[in-house]
């Protein structure tokens, strides 16, 4: 991960770091979070297949050294990126998250599946359907019309479009995860709400 570790940690307050470390070590005494523990950590249970695939993809993007675990530094770097990262850093991460097959481009199917999964987990109440949102993204930023978004098209297109940037940012809002950490793992949502979100 290189410089990302130090930079991420420096941007956090001592209190935040302490809360995150306490939560991490309480839930994961080994210091290495597996995919299963990752799901438990954030209260992600009974997920639909598409939501489960999204969580796996998120885990893989947070596992910076690709060893199959998220250690504390990866955890801090990931949360810092998502919560405090600059727009271009977040957009690069979103792109990596959406590019499920890792081919360097996002196609309509990848974006649609991820948006559906995110909405299932976050219970987003957007007026636009996932299909309408996907079509809007491609209509606005697929410059060459090839049905795929390159990193450049994605970065430039989203940064130029405030509406698109706002919707993407809200869809990946992880404040519920921060509340979970601050509440020492006590989920602020009732269990029946979590089950509803999984369907």
From Swiss-Prot:
One Gene Ontology molecular-function label: guanylate cyclase regulator activity
Membrane-spanning segments: none
Binding site for Ca(2+) 2: 99, 101, 103, 105, 110
Lipid positions (N-myristoyl glycine): 2
Biological process annotations from GO: cellular response to calcium ion; phototransduction; positive regulation of guanylate cyclase activity; regulation of signal transduction; visual perception
Domain EF-hand: 13-48, 50-85, 86-121, 129-164
Record keywords, A-Z: Calcium, Lipoprotein, Metal-binding, Myristate, Repeat, Sensory transduction, Vision
Residues recorded as bearing Deamidated asparagine in the entry: 3
GO CC entries: cone photoreceptor outer segment; photoreceptor inner segment
Annotated signal peptide: none
Tissue expression summary: Retina, in rod and cone outer segments, and pineal gland.
Binding site for Ca(2+) 3: 142, 144, 146, 148, 153
Residues reported to bind Ca(2+) 1: 63, 65, 67, 69, 74
PANTHER family per the UniProt record, alphabetical: CALCIUM BINDING PROTEINS, GUANYLYL CYCLASE-ACTIVATING PROTEIN 1
Domain notes: Binds three calcium ions (via EF-hands 2, 3 and 4) when calcium levels are high. Binds Mg(2+) when calcium levels are low.
Physiological role: Stimulates retinal guanylyl cyclase when free calcium ions concentration is low and inhibits guanylyl cyclase when free calcium ions concentration is elevated. This Ca(2+)-sensitive regulation of retinal guanylyl cyclase is a key event in recovery of the dark state of rod photoreceptors following light exposure.
Protein name: Guanylyl cyclase-activating protein 1
Source species of the chain: Gallus gallus
Highest classification ranks of the organism: Eukaryota, Metazoa, Chordata, Craniata, Vertebrata
Gene responsible for this protein: GUCA1A
